Amino acid sequence: MVDAIQVAELRRFVEQLKLNPSILHDPSLVFFKEYLRSLGAQVPKIEKTERDYEDKAETKPSFSPKHDDDDDDIMESDVELDNSDVVEPDNEPPQPMGDPTAEVTDENRDDAQSEKSKAMEAISDGRFDEAIEHLTKAVMLNPTSAILYATRASVFLKVKKPNAAIRDANVALQFNSDSAKGYKSRGMAKAMLGQWEEAAADLHVASKLDYDEEIGTMLKKVEPNAKRIEEHRRKYQRLRKEKELQRAERERRKQQEAQEREAQAALNDGEVISIHSTSELEAKTKAAKKASRLLILYFTATWCGPCRYMSPLYSNLATQHSRVVFLKVDIDKANDVAASWNISSVPTFCFIRDGKEVDKVVGADKGSLEQKIAQHSSSK
């Protein structure tokens, strides 16, 4: 299942693209732009003015994460990165690739090797475009040779064409998943595009397969940037998690307050409520349970002498304990309620918590009644 937070971030990113399509031309998003093109999408070209280039030269690029508009006061800051060697992505048509289904003869392999030798000579003389031409002929002759694609990728790096290098490195790794040169070229290309985390991942694999000083030097440049981005991401993931917890707590309090208001309206805080039927008692019991209130059910009768003594006290206790629900049942007027509770004498005080009887006081025992109220009203 796709993470809901990631889906929300993607939706916001798409909305930003609708408002400003030029975001796609950020070097760090070249992989996404290539993917869109592979699906047949048309990426709008952005015409740069002379001032645009001046601004770019004057401004140090930085990693600018998207922030969640719903994250209250969380505003993500830019990550300070060393982008001194980041280049503009090359958006030329893909270079020629060989047909992997074509039959390769020994003669083809020999000719391809000859073209590679010419390319290496051209590289040593600094004639990189010529070297690319020779290597292109070589891959057409031997289209399943991983080393030929990886070598051409390394030359594309020398002429600052990271996207072309990535395409060749990908093909090289398709034919040889253990191609150190393929991982190295792709990692260096991604570093040129400012894709620091992906660059670090590829360079680490390359170093494990066949370490050299160039890989080590590149990792020293790439890893600090990748680490800063990862630390930044974790920081804001933690902050968002904290905000989620805060929102959940606010929502819980909001619901609790709503229940309190509902209970206050239904339970007449500070007053004694007379009950006349079992249905009325059930409604009040449910309301008290929903509001996590202690409920006291007082069974009385007009002919009961001790009840006449306890009733004023009961009303006074109701004003003192406004968060306790005080109910009163006249057993002669609501004998069905009294019968359902098996009341045999009055006054009787039943203590109810979460819909269940938890205690009882029988008789005009003022001290016991006050003690039980204090005990059970503070138990939750």
From Swiss-Prot:
PROSITE patterns hit by this protein: THIOREDOXIN_1 (PS00194), THIOREDOXIN_2 (PS51352), TPR (PS50005), TPR_REGION (PS50293)
Origin: domain of life: Eukaryota
Keyword Disulfide bond found: yes
Active site per the UniProt annotation: 304, 307
Keyword Chaperone: yes
Ranges for the TPR repeats: 112-145, 147-179, 181-213
GO molecular function terms attached to this record: Hsp70 protein binding; identical protein binding; oxidoreductase activity, acting on a sulfur group of donors, disulfide as acceptor; protein dimerization activity
Disulfide bonds: 304-307
Keywords: Acetylation, Chaperone, Disulfide bond, Electron transport, Redox-active center, Repeat, TPR repeat, Transport
Positions bearing N-acetylvaline: 2
A Pfam family: Thioredoxin
Annotated site residues (Contributes to redox potential value) in this chain: 305-306
Residues annotated as domain Thioredoxin: 252-378
Disruption phenotype: High sensitivity to heat shock.
Segments of skewed composition (Acidic residues): 69-91
GO biological process, one term: protein complex oligomerization
GO CC terms of this entry: histone deacetylase complex
Disordered as annotated region, ranges: 49-115, 240-265
Family named by the database record: Belongs to the thioredoxin family.
Subunit architecture: Oligomerization under high temperature.
Function: Thiol-disulfide oxidoreductase that possesses insulin disulfide bonds reducing activity, disulfide reductase, foldase chaperone and holdase chaperone activities. Heat shock causes oligomerization and formation of high molecular weiht (HMW) complexes with concomitant functional switching from a disulfide reductase and foldase chaperone to a holdase chaperone. May interact with HSP70 proteins through the TPR repeats.
Protein name: TPR repeat-containing thioredoxin TDX
